[in-house]
Swiss-Prot record:
It comes from Bacillus cereus (strain Q1). This is UPF0756 membrane protein BCQ_4399. It holds the Pfam family DUF441. HAMAP family: UPF0756. The chain crosses the membrane at residues 8-28, 54-74, 87-107, 117-137.
Length: 153
């Protein structure tokens, strides 16, 4: 008999293939590999607790590569500071970090919200070619909206 989790992942794999979303299909392939080689019992708890941090670290490394290669240096930083786009990007970075902080609080106090966030991320990745950067930012946005709603109650 096929387990519910295997069936669920298989359905998501089909959605990923239909949507031609390589990130989703590779992620599910890795999960299937871990699950069917019985490494899942050891690796899944680690990925569940540390996976987002690992992902953020990999993304951060990718973003910093142009600095490491010398493609971006102090000259480019100075030129960027003259652009209002750079100041918008700076403000956006601050806003996202603050939203993520609220998201951590929400996930801590209301962990069942994670299910809705995961489904929202899956829908965006599978159907709209979104990028799964999601639970912390998603929960941060949810926290901000919920806080605004609470102010008007």
């Amino acid at each position: 008999m096929i387990s519910q989790s295997t069936l669920f992942l298989f359905i998501l794999l089909i959605i990923g293939l239909i949507a031609k979303n390589q990130s989703l299909t590779v992620a599910i392939g890795v999960l299937f590999l871990l699950k069917f080689t019985f490494l899942g019992d050891k690796v899944f708890p680690y990925l569940q607790t540390k996976g987002i941090n690992l992902g953020v670290t990999v993304i951060t490394i990718a973003v910093l590569v142009p600095i490491a290669t010398g493609e971006i240096g102090f000259k480019q930083l100075g030129e960027a500071a003259k652009s209002y786009y750079a100041w918008i990007a700076l403000a956006s970075g601050v806003a996202v970090a603050l939203l993520a902080k609220g998201g951590v609080q929400l996930l801590t106090t209301d962990p069942h919200i994670t299910t809705a966030l995961v489904f929202g991320t899956i829908i965006a990745v599978a159907l709209f070619n979104g990028v799964a950067v999601g639970p912390l930012i998603g929960s941060g946005i949810a926290y901000a909206v919920m806080s605004i709603i609470q102010m008007f109650k």
